Design a protein with these regions (language model features):
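Conserved, aromatic- and glycine-enriched, well-ordered alpha/beta core segments
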Residues: 31, 36-52
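Cys/His-coordinated zinc-binding microdomains
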Residues: 21, 55-58
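Short, charged/polar surface micro-motifs in flexible loops or helix N-caps
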Residues: 25-26, 37-38, 58-60
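Short cysteine-rich loop/turn motifs with clustered Cys
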Residues: 2-33
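Polybasic, low-complexity binding patches
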Residues: 41-48, 59-97
Length: 97
């Protein structure tokens, strides 16, 4: 991993879960979620196309709570991956195409 990617992922994690913050649940430790929108079945998105999610909103929360338990319902509940990516990029002051 490049140093710039490592720094970016550290800054992402330091934000805390974007969903918890949007729901006024306070700061929660974040894992890195590489967005799936526009990716092939077994491809991982570039590190710059990642959002910070707590373990509940990332993988453990169940249907409608965790993105990996049902992305379409999760996006109806919390916003699309691309909307949240745009928010994160604005907060970090970075903009990637």
């Amino acid at each position: 991993m490049k140093k710039a990617d490592s720094l970016h992922l550290s800054r992402l994690a330091a934000l805390g879960c974007i969903v918890c913050r949007n729901q006024n649940l306070g700061e929660t430790p974040a894992e890195i979620h590489h967005i799936r929108t526009g990716q092939g079945a077994s491809q991982r998105a570039d590190h710059r196309k990642s959002i910070p999610l707590c373990h509940m909103h990332h993988r453990n929360g169940g249907y409608g709570v965790a993105i990996h338990a049902g992305r379409k319902q999760w996006e109806r509940n919390f916003g699309t991956e691309l909307q949240l990516l745009e928010q994160v990029q604005l907060e970090l002051g970075v903009f990637y195409a």
